[in-house]
Amino acid sequence: SLVGSEMCIRDRTGSTVINVKGKYPSEFSEGYASLQINEKWGYIDKTGKIAIEPKYDMAYSFTDGLALVSEGGREGFIDTDGNYVIKLTDKVDYASFSDGYALIRKGNKWGFIDKKGNIVIKPAFYGAADFKEGFASIMEKVGDKYLSGYINKKGKMITKAIYEEVDDFQEGMACVKKNGKYGFINKKGKLVVNAIYDNAFSYENGLAYVAKGSNAYFIDKTGKKVITIK
């Protein structure tokens, strides 16, 4: 909560555990939270102590040990000591790290860098999402449409860009939409649950919620209906 510039962070019981001056705190991630102090962004640790001095125009959450920050219209990545691991640049746009890689945009195309800043997958896609479980969805122009598929960390397509909508991999499966219907693929790119559903959500604890017409179910990873929702 925030009163003026005095901020308090509470635990799940509602008890105040940290008092610190600042605004717009992020959630803690990897032990740190970003916040704004005197119009600049920095980081505090879980004791409320300033861990990285507020000097950035913007500062994002730590993921994979690195945080995306911006200064003077340029972006780069710092470690938890505040040292630049990937230097500031205005030549490209970045997103935060996930699964060891970060999205990078050059012009209107997207690719990926590793934690040393090396381009490991050249910006060649019209759209892309973070890597999850070793795979990322990408978007390509197919005729007059933009369709999605998936790549592995070597940039190899595991399925062509044939889907209208895609989700991240979760528990080894990814929800995809084809011809207006939803199904699921595995990490080999094989459609193992046919795209026959009007709605579907990602797998959790081995089951996925799906709906077809007025009927709804939880299915297992073979597509078998395990629970019928009445």
Regions picked out by a protein language model, each given a short descriptive name:
Residues 5-6, 11-230:
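Residue-level detector of conserved, function-critical positions
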